[in-house]
Amino acid sequence: MLSENENSISILKTPKINNEQAKINHILPKINPNVNQALFNNQNERKRKSFSYFKDNKTYVLMNNNNNGNKKNSFEKRIIKNYFALSQAGKTSDGLIKTNQDSYLVLTKINNFSNFNVFAVFDGHGPEGHLVSQFLVKYFTDFFNNNQEIKKCSREIEVFNLFLHANYKVLHHAILLSEEKLKEQKNINSEYSGSTCCMLIQVSQKLICANVGDSRAILISEMIKEDIINLSNDHKPNFKKELERIKKYGGVVEKCLYEDGVFDGPYRVWNSSKQEYPGLAISRSIGDTKATKLGVLAVPEFNLKTIKSNMKYIVIASDGIWEYLTNKNVTEIIKQFYNLDDAKGAIEELIKKASEKWAQEGESADDITVIIIFF
């Protein structure tokens, strides 16, 4: 039987922490062991050099905000004012803490450009979903930091043109290649495990959102009244374009059939009306190789926006937020914290409210991951 709020059937496995991961645990601040957070507030960690570390099955990236020695810096003032990221593990219906299958990525000042930044949320699912999402953090960290075409760029506009060229060819290829590289990982079985990818790339005044799955990014702007702009579209099996593709591949989209003969829960992708596998509640995913032949693909959708003076902030989050909170609910919670320039407080309150909603439903709670970016 499937849980209504899970993207797939999961037999959770706790990954082992290797020696290198254990060695750096002593540098971590004392925080709630069930909440993973990175101090991405620009008021903190200014003197640290950039580094990454692991804790509680998570990858963190802390960035140095010091601009000294940045010869390629084309802006004296950064466009992004403040940002913060936090992830909280879900709970079983018995109240036990689950393995957090979410991961997130924050890379700032890539290639020494003050306004070349990447923010991404990866929501893993399946028996080894946590390993898939962690792999994607490592893969995209390497891609953005070491890609030779990016390194050749001497100005931010060149980076943007590189990404925009031929309908986002470089980014499109990078995301598809991530799935191919995932298949090569001997320690990860991705047949029935995968991850979403909701990625925001900021280059100067331009925003590119690349999305696979149902993690979501929204942009809030304000002229006369507050306006919510979807930077990504959820990839759900019952949505027209997704449904047509899945049927073309021979897949079946149905709600889960329970023992009492009732179809219930979200629409899922199945191999047949017998509902043998994979039972995915999303129609695009990185991984889930057994579902590829059913039309569940890693093909990203892109959205392009220009940052304007009336734009206030961006929220990127896994469906642990969106399951019970609407876009409007989220903006109402964040509003007071935006006025105080408190991205950390905004995320903590957002996760608190989402957790309360999950508890009210009396079900197991999903992992929750949020990135907030203030302009």
Language-model features: where?
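PP2C/PPM-type serine/threonine phosphatase catalytic domain
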Residues: 1-375
